[in-house]
């Protein structure tokens, strides 16, 4: 397992180029059990970052529709979803080592066979590793909203990234986003409105009800208890 989660960029003179990311590499505590899970199970479930496209048949035992989840947090809901849909293959991307360790722990406990995870920046994974026209669904649940206006440049779900996703989805594939930030929800609607390939599956062209397939996370439960409203956005890729 590689410890770097971004690819450093340099100019022709060898000077490091500062990049804007949708995450901050916080020095959060990775527990002993999480580190142990990484050591034991990464070789079984983890996929190292590479600069060329993945061959999905080489990382999954069975051929099946592929669902990509970006930013799976602890991985508990991702693992449960993979258990609920054994006829699908799941690929998760996460930038925090604690989340990687936690997900590996859950997956190994339930002996999940249809899940693989990547420890790297999602933008670079999408650019380099995900072949075009291969994903049946992309799900991004509770991405960092970066509330302050000066931090909006860090938001993952900008127009350029949403366009990248259109290249990776199959026709009629689904993009499903959930957020507890109303301002971010409307920001996403604004960023995606000019991308003609996306069809909003909401009757009112805004939000949909939470589908039963999306498991309510601990983070979401906490927000609901605090009176927060959850916004589900769902789009289908059309020709």
Curated annotation (Swiss-Prot):
GO terms for molecular function: tRNA (guanine(46)-N7)-methyltransferase activity. The keyword Kinase does not apply. It comes from the Bacteria. The active site is at residue 144. It is an enzyme of class 2 (transferase). Keywords: Methyltransferase, S-adenosyl-L-methionine, Transferase, tRNA processing. S-adenosyl-L-methionine binds at residues 69, 94, 121, 144. Substrate binds at residues 148, 180, 217-220. Pathway: tRNA modification; N(7)-methylguanine-tRNA biosynthesis. Its EC number is 2.1.1.33. GO terms for cellular component: tRNA methyltransferase complex. It catalyses: guanosine(46) in tRNA + S-adenosyl-L-methionine = N(7)-methylguanosine(46) in tRNA + S-adenosyl-L-homocysteine. Pfam families: Methyltransf_4. Monomer. Catalyzes the formation of N(7)-methylguanine at position 46 (m7G46) in tRNA. PANTHER family: 3-DEOXY-D-MANNO-OCTULOSONIC-ACID TRANSFERASE/TRNA GUANINE-N 7 - -METHYLTRANSFERASE, PENTACOTRIPEPTIDE-REPEAT REGION OF PRORP DOMAIN-CONTAINING PROTEIN. Belongs to the class I-like SAM-binding methyltransferase superfamily. TrmB family. This is tRNA (guanine-N(7)-)-methyltransferase. It comes from Buchnera aphidicola subsp. Acyrthosiphon pisum (strain Tuc7).
């Amino acid at each position: 397992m590689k410890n770097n989660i971004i690819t450093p960029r340099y100019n022709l003179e060898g000077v490091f180029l500062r990049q804007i990311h949708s995450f901050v590499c916080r020095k959060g505590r990775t527990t002993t059990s999480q580190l142990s899970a990484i050591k034991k199970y990464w070789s079984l479930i983890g996929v190292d970052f590479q600069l060329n496209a993945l061959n999905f048949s080489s990382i999954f035992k069975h051929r099946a529709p592929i669902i990509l989840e970006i930013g799976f947090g602890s991985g508990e809901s991702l693992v449960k979803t993979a258990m609920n849909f054994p006829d699908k293959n799941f690929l998760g991307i996460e930038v925090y080592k604690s989340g990687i360790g936690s997900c590996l722990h859950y997956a190994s406990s339930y002996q999940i066979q249809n899940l693989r995870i990547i420890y790297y920046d999602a933008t670079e994974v999408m650019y380099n590793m995900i072949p075009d026209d291969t994903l049946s669904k992309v799900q991004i649940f509770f991405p960092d909203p970066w509330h302050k206006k000066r931090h909006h440049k860090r938001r993952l779900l900008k127009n350029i990234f949403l366009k990248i996703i259109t290249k990776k989805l199959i026709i009629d594939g689904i993009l499903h986003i959930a957020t507890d930030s109303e301002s971010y929800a409307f920001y996403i609607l604004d960023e995606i409105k000019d991308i003609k390939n996306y069809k909003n599956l909401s009757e009112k062209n805004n939000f949909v009800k939470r589908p039963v397939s999306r498991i309510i996370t601990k983070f979401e439960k906490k927000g609901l208890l605090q009176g927060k409203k959850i916004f589900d956005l769902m789009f289908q890729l059309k020709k």
